[in-house]
């Protein structure tokens, strides 16, 4: 499916160069520096689906993104930031075959909250997570190993993700052992970090055009998101 011009404009933000304090280029996060030996991530187990209300919104945003040409693949990653970091709050869903492929732990930004994420931002240097619909794009090998670039599709909500170098990557501070020791996962500088034992499998599965939907019950975003109100706004799509 052809990606519309709006996506090309968003991706063009790469030309702005690197932003200091970004998730992908930062020194090891403070939580990781403090962590001693941590247990290896538990084997992934395909668990229940996201909560019905979250899944309904995620599917609505995914279908709108497909209709508008932003999403190429029938895969949907759902992150429910309303859940504590100690719960497996990331799902990768095969929409076409109606099945969950992965259900994993995922970290939020260090300034979004402790065990619970409560604050979100689109601003470079905020070290907070962002909400809304993203496109999973290309991969590269960085300081965290295999990493996946995310393109934010929502103006004013997450469309500076590429400038902020918000990527999906693996981290030692995302593990059952770390959570048991600290009562929460470690935190990133805004990136959705995954357990280092499974991140490469997840990234390789969702790369190159699938949807990533990050949820929190923020009233302003829920009311204004173009991808959650597609029927009313589709005629105005770029």
What positions do the PLM features span?
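Cell wall/extracellular polymer interaction/catalysis modules
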Residues: 26-189, 197-205, 210, 214-238
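Bacterial N-terminal signal peptides that target proteins for export
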Residues: 1-11
């Amino acid at each position: 499916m052809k990606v519309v011009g709006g996506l090309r404009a968003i991706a063009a933000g790469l030309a702005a160069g690197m932003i200091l304090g970004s998730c992908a280029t930062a020194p090891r996060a403070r939580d990781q520096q403090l962590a001693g030996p941590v247990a290896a991530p538990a084997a992934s187990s395909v668990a229940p689906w996201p909560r019905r209300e979250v899944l309904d919104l995620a599917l609505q945003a995914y279908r709108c993104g497909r209709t508008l040409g932003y999403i190429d693949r029938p895969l949907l990653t759902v992150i429910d930031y309303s859940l504590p970091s100690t719960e497996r709050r990331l799902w990768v869903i095969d929409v076409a075959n109606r099945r969950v492929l992965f259900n994993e732990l995922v970290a939020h930004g260090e300034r979004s909250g402790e065990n619970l994420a409560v604050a979100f931002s689109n601003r470079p240097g905020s070290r907070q997570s962002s909400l809304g619909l993203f496109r999973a794009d290309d991969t590269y090998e960085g300081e965290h190993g295999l990493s996946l670039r995310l393109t934010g599709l929502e103006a004013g909500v997450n469309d500076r993700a590429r400038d902020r170098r918000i990527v999906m990557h693996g981290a030692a501070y995302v593990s059952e052992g770390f959570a048991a020791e600290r009562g929460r996962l470690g935190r990133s500088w805004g990136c959705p970090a995954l357990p280092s034992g499974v991140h490469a499998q997840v990234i390789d599965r969702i790369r190159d055009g699938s949807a990533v939907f990050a949820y929190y019950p923020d009233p302003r975003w829920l009311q204004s998101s173009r991808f959650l109100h597609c029927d009313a706004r589709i005629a105005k799509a770029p």
